[in-house]
């Protein structure tokens, strides 16, 4: 009698559900996955090596391009590592601005995730709803940094500039009538802080809309419940972090366990799952959006009442003001020197980790006393999660592989780096 053999299937890198350039070699018995072998490296850009030939400040934009959905949180890990080596104090206002933008970035990431994950599974409407809200937050990015995605807003010692007093408004055009324009600019008459406040006042209702579409949806539950189960013990052994480990019932969050900036002064909860399946990880991320709203509201309240500097007064690191530069020759020379030669960081090594929307994002920085890093190592959360894909997918159907890739929230910028 003829022997039945397993067959091999290439999933990606051109597959729309492969989240970028994932090539997954699946060994199948009928439609059941026996083995899943991820092939990475198709988006490798040598970020760690490039950083060795750039000054410390020139590498900030490279961080944006790692996980290109959670831009500012990547920058945060990098500048924290530099600040540890320099031993400089960051002004309190800058710390609150950083925390506020970390949470804005977390919401941006989770909106992209919920839209793409639902789209992969077959629910198209959520994607359109999620992008409606992302647009507002992208406008906030643009208001503070001039760029919608790659902001390069954080600086060693603080942030590039304070929150602007006026929120940019939409201009009249052929495709918009006056009524539509007035509606679009409704919340944009005040400052950037007013706009963010207005957004986070409206946002919980939007999260309710996503939950109405998904949480009790019979098809959604059939596709997610009991899929990709990871036990708490195994989650620890696999090195999972972020929503992946919290979905398995372990309340591990760097914002609580190893607080950085002002997270120890802010009141919020860590959502955890019970069963460790895709559905629990979905619920954890949805609740994280609500907690980010709480954190953002507290930051806004503090920032309204406490004006102050947003970058350190250490002039070895911080550039002079734009106004001073245009009137004072010494300031101009100082600015030129700082951006051509850069600042020198004392010899030593430091590890800084932040609670990234996807997990623990760490930067290990080694300095030999020069104006460039001697070695920069990036600890990307997605790398450990993708390593667990084989174990999570075994025994499931081929259609469930898409759900598992979606629940891991894979972005290849940080995995291949």
Swiss-Prot record:
It catalyses: a quinone + NADH + 5 H(+)(in) = a quinol + NAD(+) + 4 H(+)(out). Its main location: membrane. Gene3D superfamilies: Cytochrome-c3 Hydrogenase, chain B. Its EC number is 7.1.1.-. InterPro entries: NADH_Q_OxRdtase_suD, NADH_UbQ_OxRdtase_49kDa_CS, NDH1_su_D/H, NiFe-Hase_large. It is found in: Cell inner membrane. GO terms for molecular function: NAD binding; NADH:ubiquinone reductase (non-electrogenic) activity; quinone binding. It is a peripheral membrane protein. NDH-1 shuttles electrons from NADH, via FMN and iron-sulfur (Fe-S) centers, to quinones in the respiratory chain. The immediate electron acceptor for the enzyme in this species is believed to be ubiquinone. Couples the redox reaction to proton translocation (for every two electrons transferred, four hydrogen ions are translocated across the cytoplasmic membrane), and thus conserves the redox energy in a proton gradient. Belongs to the complex I 49 kDa subunit family. This is NADH-quinone oxidoreductase subunit D. The lineage of its organism: Bacteria, Pseudomonadati, Pseudomonadota, Betaproteobacteria, Burkholderiales. The gene is nuoD.
